[in-house]
Design a protein with these regions (language model features):
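A general lysine-centric signal
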Residues: 2, 26-27
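Bacterial N-terminal signal peptides that target proteins for export
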Residues: 2-12
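C-terminal motif of bacterial Sec signal peptides marking the signal peptidase cleavage site
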Residues: 21-24
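Low-complexity, intrinsically disordered segments exposed to solvent
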Residues: 27-300
């Protein structure tokens, strides 16, 4: 009986020990889940992901502008879609405002001579053809036409605003085209965007590769052009949050749409992740942020 009692006691002790271990494991898991699911952390992740999406949109707008420099604007075709009539037609087949409310200066204003500095001056503010208010100056230095392999366009800003957002930093586009596909490397260096309505800011650095995947055979008809974007970025904001991002499903940009229409970006912040989903090809300004599987709709 003593042996049986001892064995039973040992078995009971093992069961109790195992139960305590399981209870301890469950407690640890619940703590981790609670940490990742607090409203404050969810809000911080959503804020960082929204900042990422807005930064992408605003600096993509700079790419569009530098790519739309044509002979009617600057005396010669400098951009990659230069045959399109009118600045800011890119991404807007139904222009909001037909009145030109900006000035352009070119130095030297001699066709074929590079480098060439192009300054677009929006003055104290005007409503552009894509429906956005801009003011200040965009200053771009072209080493050659954007369609020439190896050409670079370096853009900086002087008191430049898009709606309520002040834009700072350096935007560089380099032509990396091959014999059968047009491509560009696009960098944002020390980018900063400040919302003057609430003084919130975000700093952003980005490295993206842009490939033209449709429309390569119709050089003089850009409306069928489609671009694939891959790459990564990192940023921080005035809320004290930092993050990094990676394109996990190539972003798709159509010439005929001013917004990214498809693709996914994974954002990482303090060991937490979010997924930014641009949709399935529909041309709209809506994206969805998924945090712990929960969707949050944002408007770009």
């Amino acid at each position: 009986m003593k042996k049986i009692t001892t064995a039973a006691s040992l078995l009971l002790a093992l069961i109790l020990t195992g139960a305590l271990m399981l209870a301890g494991c469950k407690k640890d898991v619940s703590i981790n889940n609670a940490q990742s699911d607090t409203p404050q952390e969810t809000a911080a992740t959503q804020e960082a992901t929204t900042d990422e999406a807005e930064s992408e949109a605003i600096f993509d707008d700079v790419f569009n502008i530098t790519a739309s420099m044509n002979s009617s604007q600057v005396g010669e075709d400098l951009g990659m879609n230069a045959n399109v009539s009118g600045l800011f037609e890119l991404g807007s087949t139904n222009p909001t405002n037909q009145v030109r409310c900006f000035t352009i200066s070119v130095v030297p204003n001699i066709p074929g001579v590079f480098p060439k500095t192009v300054t677009i001056d929006f003055g104290t503010g005007c409503l552009c053809r894509d429906g956005k208010y801009r003011k200040g100056k965009i200053v771009s230095i072209y080493t050659n036409r954007m369609t020439v392999p190896g050409a670079k366009v370096s853009t900086t800003f002087v008191g430049y605003f898009v709606d309520s957002f002040k834009v700072e930093g350096t935007h560089i586009t380099e032509n990396t085209s091959t014999s059968n596909m047009q491509g560009w490397k696009v960098q944002v260096i020390n980018g900063k965007i400040t919302n003057t309505n609430n003084n919130r800011w975000r700093q952003w650095n980005s490295l993206k590769n842009v490939l033209q995947i449709e429309g390569n055979g119709t050089v003089h008809f850009p409306l069928d052009d489609v671009y694939k974007i891959t790459g990564n970025a990192h940023g921080s904001n005035s809320g004290g949050h930092t993050w990094s991002s990676l394109v996990v499903d190539p972003l798709i940009k159509k010439f005929s749409c001013r917004w990214i229409v498809q693709g996914k970006v994974r954002l990482s912040r303090d060991n937490r992740e979010a997924l930014l989903d641009y949709g399935n090809g529909t041309c709209d300004n809506v994206a969805v942020i998924f945090i712990n599987g929960v969707p949050h709709i944002i408007t770009l």
